[in-house]
């Protein structure tokens, strides 16, 4: 399997392991740029993103690639367009050394202006499939890229998950830079913006932060809905918005909903967002879905038979990301089994790999059952007051999986596990996350429980076929 296709399959697995917000912010725009023996190099859009990947997701990436390739893989991180790599993630890092690296990296984080724009080279206008569902957003994005700051300012693009909002933001940046290479263009997610602000406040470098974001020609901020309820972030973004707008600079914003439906958003921000052009993106129709599959197949270097294209397009109606995921599973199965892509193979690939359908079957009861089965403890022991390590570890893994797989709140998890306090749950989740970076046995246990959980969840689906 080629590196591009391997990474698409890996991303499909990683999307099941981490929260949607984390996947969208940190993993979605990465690439596997090199695979040499037992060494994989992952490229991120910026040094800050590479930093977050190394600190938060290295263990999951390493585990996924090792499983797919059938051999231990060491993961390295770099930045798009840079030859010098970030420090590798060792397969057996010492916990003390890991903590030291994280601390020093945090101190070295630069907030001064840099040439990094955070753009993904795959997301261009040429690769964006236009249909009735996105025609207005596409036309507005083109106009903004060609004449930034002159009209449609701000441009606010909204729509459901996986419909192409992020693609358009990156495409604006690429086209604007192609027209005027000296422009200062910046793409950033609202979560990265918030994290950089927190880091700047912590290290007393807010002036650097403001200089960075208020001297940009085109600022594109993704998933603005995540700043809702964050007063300090909203305050800083409000002043950044005003500074750029008054200087005639272009602002492009994306969200999963229109401004009026974003809860806990400051009225003054809502007013400014609504003062520009609001362009929505709807789910693609059948013809657009077919065109997307053909284009994505071309990018992967495969020609999709027309009956397979129609089958997948009719089967998946919700969003583009699920279309891409289905295509990746089909291509991966064909290459792994050395078979041509046929309708029968596509049916098999989607039946076995319909992660969304399996995920919908997950329940707290299934999680607790899988943990009990793997560790051979009873449910009464798991939710009871016992504090033996043989019980505490499975309980903490249950907390972690209830959080990661089902997205339950800390309070809900505590209620499921014998009425425990939310601080106890938070400690358990954090401890598992921390130890997953260095404890190979724990990673194996979590992987085994997760595999058992998904097998249990597949059972009701299998009975339907």
UniProtKB/Swiss-Prot annotation:
A molecular-function term among this protein's GO annotations: lipid binding
An annotated GO cellular component: plasma membrane
Superkingdom: Bacteria
Region (Domain III, AAA+ region): 118-334
Main location: cytoplasm
Keywords of this entry: ATP-binding, Cytoplasm, DNA replication, DNA-binding, Lipid-binding, Nucleotide-binding
PROSITE patterns: DNAA (PS01008)
Ranges for region Domain I, interacts with DnaA modulators: 1-72
InterPro entries referenced in this protein's UniProt entry, alphabetically: AAA+_ATPase (IPR003593), Chromosome_initiator_DnaA (IPR001957), Chromosome_initiator_DnaA-like (IPR020591), Chromosome_initiator_DnaA_CS (IPR018312), DnaA_C (IPR013159), DnaA_dom (IPR013317), DnaA_N_dom (IPR024633), DnaA_N_sf (IPR038454)
Polar residues bias: start-end ranges: 103-113
Cell compartment(s), UniProt: Cytoplasm
Chain positions covered by the region annotation Disordered: 80-118
Residue span of region Domain II: 72-117
Gene Ontology biological-process entries: DNA replication initiation; regulation of DNA replication
Binding positions (ATP): 162, 164-166
CDD domains attached to this UniProt entry: AAA (cd00009), Bac_DnaA_C (cd06571)
Keyword tRNA-binding carried by entry: no
Region called Domain IV, binds dsDNA, residue ranges: 335-465
Function field: Plays an essential role in the initiation and regulation of chromosomal replication. ATP-DnaA binds to the origin of replication (oriC) to initiate formation of the DNA replication initiation complex once per cell cycle. Binds the DnaA box (a 9 base pair repeat at the origin) and separates the double-stranded (ds)DNA. Forms a right-handed helical filament on oriC DNA; dsDNA binds to the exterior of the filament while single-stranded (ss)DNA is stabiized in the filament's interior.
Record-linked PANTHER family: CHROMOSOMAL REPLICATION INITIATOR PROTEIN DNAA
Assembly behavior: Oligomerizes as a right-handed, spiral filament on DNA at oriC.
Domain text: Domain I is involved in oligomerization and binding regulators, domain II is flexibile and of varying length in different bacteria, domain III forms the AAA+ region, while domain IV binds dsDNA.
Similarity-based family: Belongs to the DnaA family.
Name by which UniProt lists this protein: Chromosomal replication initiator protein DnaA
Source taxonomy: Bacteria, Pseudomonadati, Thermomicrobiota, Thermomicrobia, Thermomicrobiales
Gene coding for it: dnaA
């Amino acid at each position: 399997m080629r590196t591009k296709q391997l990474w698409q399959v890996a991303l499909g697995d990683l999307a099941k392991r981490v929260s949607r917000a984390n996947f969208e912010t940190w993993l979605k725009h990465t690439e596997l740029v090199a695979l040499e023996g037992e060494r994989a190099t992952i490229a991120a859009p910026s040094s800050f993103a590479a930093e977050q990947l190394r600190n938060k997701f290295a263990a999951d990436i390493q585990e996924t690639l090792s499983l797919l390739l059938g051999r231990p893989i060491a993961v390295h991180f770099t930045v798009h367009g840079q030859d010098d790599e970030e420090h590798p993630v060792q397969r057996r890092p010492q916990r003390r050394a890991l903590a030291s690296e994280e601390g020093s990296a945090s101190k070295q984080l630069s907030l001064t202006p840099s040439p990094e724009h955070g753009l993904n080279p795959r997301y261009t206008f040429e690769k964006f499939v236009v249909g009735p569902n996105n025609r207005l957003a596409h036309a507005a994005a083109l106009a903004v890229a060609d004449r930034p700051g002159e009209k449609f300012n701000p441009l606010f693009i909204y729509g459901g998950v996986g419909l192409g909002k992020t693609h358009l933001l990156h495409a604006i940046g690429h086209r604007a830079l192609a027209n005027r290479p000296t422009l200062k263009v910046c793409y950033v997610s609202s979560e990265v913006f918030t994290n950089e602000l927190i880091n700047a406040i912590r290290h007393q470098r807010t002036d650097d932060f403001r200089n960075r974001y208020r001297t940009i020609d085109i600022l594109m901020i993704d998933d603005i809905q995540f700043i809702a309820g964050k007063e300090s972030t909203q305050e800083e973004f409000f002043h950044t918005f005003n500074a750029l707008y008054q200087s005639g600079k272009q602002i492009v914003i994306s969200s999963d909903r229109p401004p009026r439906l974003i809860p806990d958003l400051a009225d003054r921000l809502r007013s400014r967002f609504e003062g520009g052009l609001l362009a929505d993106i709807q789910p693609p129709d059948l013809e657009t879905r077919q065109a997307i599959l053909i284009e994505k197949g071309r990018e992967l270097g495969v020609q999709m038979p027309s009956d397979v294209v129609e089958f997948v397009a009719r089967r998946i109606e919700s969003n583009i990301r699920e279309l891409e995921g289905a295509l990746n599973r089909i291509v991966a199965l064909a290459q792994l089994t050395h078979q041509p892509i046929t309708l029968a193979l596509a049916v098999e690939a989607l039946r076995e790999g319909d992660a969304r359908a399996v995920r919908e079957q997950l329940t707290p009861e299934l999680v607790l059952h899988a943990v009990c089965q793997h560790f051979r403890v009873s449910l009464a022991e798991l939710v009871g007051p016992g504090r033996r390590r043989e019980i505490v570890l499975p309980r903490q893994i249950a907390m972690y999986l209830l959080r990661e797989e089902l997205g339950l709140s800390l309070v809900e998890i505590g209620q499921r596990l014998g009425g425990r306090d939310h601080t106890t749950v938070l400690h358990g989740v954090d401890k598992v996350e921390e130890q997953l970076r260095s404890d190979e046995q724990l990673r194996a246990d979590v992987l085994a429980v997760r595999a058992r959980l998904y097998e249990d969840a597949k059972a009701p689906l299998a009975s339907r076929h």
